[in-house]
Amino acid sequence: MTARSSLTIVLAAGEGTRMRSHLPKVLHPVAHQTLLAHVLTAAPKGTGTSLAVVIGPDHQAVADEARRIRPDAVTFVQAERLGTAHAVLAAREAIARGVDDLLIAFGDTPLISAETFARLRAPLANGAALAALGFRAADPAGYGRFIVEGDRLVAIREQADASADERKIDLCNAGVMAIDGRRALAILDKIGNANSKGEYYLTDAVEIVREQGWESVVIETSEDEVRGINTKAQLAEAESVMQARLRKAAMEAGVTLIAPETVYLSADTVFGKDVTIEPFVVIGPGVSIADGTVIHSFSHIVETTLGRNVSIGPYARLRPGTSLGDGARIGNFVETKAATLEAGVKVNHLSYIGDATVGANSNIGAGTITCNYDGFKKHKTIIGQGAFVGTNSSLVAPVKIGNGAYIGSGSVITRDVPDDAMALERNQQTIREGGAARYREMKTRGKKPEK
């Protein structure tokens, strides 16, 4: 059987004024990805699918984000905000090309899943003209109610127009719909604006379908999945739901979370097996963690690749461009950025390793700094395999430390060090016999010590 073709239209033209932000609403993040990115990721993809995003005027950033996530996305501008049906018809050109299934979603519902989109499409394959997504609301006040007769949806009644009995209905409209693509324009073009706001409401499609003698059905999902984001408080609620999902998925995949509610993950985090994460860890976007790795408490990791059996933290910060080989160790109060640390490297305490490559099995002593910035440009430090860098050393880039080289503690290294060489740079130590006793005596007499 040939797979059904689909067009997903994502409505993302809203101003989001209640967010109190200069950022378009759909570009706010949940689990380190934009609201829009979550919806576009869940939308059908692959052969026979197409995607349209309806944006508002002057929302080029939204168009750019859509194409970043889904290069196949085509954007359309809703010049005037005259209701949801009006927004859908902004993409008339895409609808007119003809598909089996037309899906209509909202760019501010980041919790919707690919599985729900698939369930919503299923009735269309069986002849339904429209399938509407609904949920059982804990508090239905303010939502449109689904009026059903048997298995059929006959109307969506807004709160203001609902009777006393209809207001008792807890099956509410999520706004997401699937419409038979071959009948979509015939339905949408019949929607009028004879209402107090003079707007074109997508919900009117249900009664138009009924008038035509066609079938509309309801597909139920959880209230969490169709949460719309209009305020920063709702954004925080969605974050909480998403984090709970991500934590559960991680643990089901074999990750040990010691205190799950204290760990914050990104939607794109990739875990191997037998990974352990201690309390109060933040994992930002672009992080991949291989088997057996342990992340200790209060570590913050972004755009980083961790090999197998790596140990991180506690109190470590791994910034973008960090890559750690198998068995590498990053200890407490260590920061890395744009750094490749090969297998077995140890940076156990109080160090900054930036714009650097560290060869396998090298040891970087406490307090070591790669001095990568000269006030104008960043420069690279290259440390060979099996090197030993003593504590409190400064490596002034650009500089190369050879394989097996030793750097004495307290050194400021400004020139390349050959393989197996020892480099030591510090002032000669001066010892004055009895000097401490004389100093104390002078201080107690209120006199300055002799030079």
From Swiss-Prot:
Catalytic residues of the enzyme: H349 (proton acceptor)
Enzyme class: transferase
Superkingdom of source: Bacteria
Cofactor note (record): Binds 1 Mg(2+) ion per subunit.
Linker: annotated span: 233-253
Primary location group: cytoplasm
Positions contributing to acetyl-CoA binding: A366, N372, Y373, S409, R426
Pathway entry: Nucleotide-sugar biosynthesis; UDP-N-acetyl-alpha-D-glucosamine biosynthesis; N-acetyl-alpha-D-glucosamine 1-phosphate from alpha-D-glucosamine 6-phosphate (route II): step 2/2; Nucleotide-sugar biosynthesis; UDP-N-acetyl-alpha-D-glucosamine biosynthesis; UDP-N-acetyl-alpha-D-glucosamine from N-acetyl-alpha-D-glucosamine 1-phosphate: step 1/1; Bacterial outer membrane biogenesis; LPS lipid A biosynthesis
UniProt keywords, alphabetically: Acyltransferase, Cell shape, Cell wall biogenesis/degradation, Cytoplasm, Magnesium, Metal-binding, Multifunctional enzyme, Nucleotidyltransferase, Peptidoglycan synthesis, Repeat, Transferase
UniProt key word Acyltransferase: yes
Known role: Catalyzes the last two sequential reactions in the de novo biosynthetic pathway for UDP-N-acetylglucosamine (UDP-GlcNAc). The C-terminal domain catalyzes the transfer of acetyl group from acetyl coenzyme A to glucosamine-1-phosphate (GlcN-1-P) to produce N-acetylglucosamine-1-phosphate (GlcNAc-1-P), which is converted into UDP-GlcNAc by the transfer of uridine 5-monophosphate (from uridine 5-triphosphate), a reaction catalyzed by the N-terminal domain.
Protein name according to UniProt: Bifunctional protein GlmU
Species per Swiss-Prot/TrEMBL record: Bradyrhizobium diazoefficiens (strain JCM 10833 / BCRC 13528 / IAM 13628 / NBRC 14792 / USDA 110)
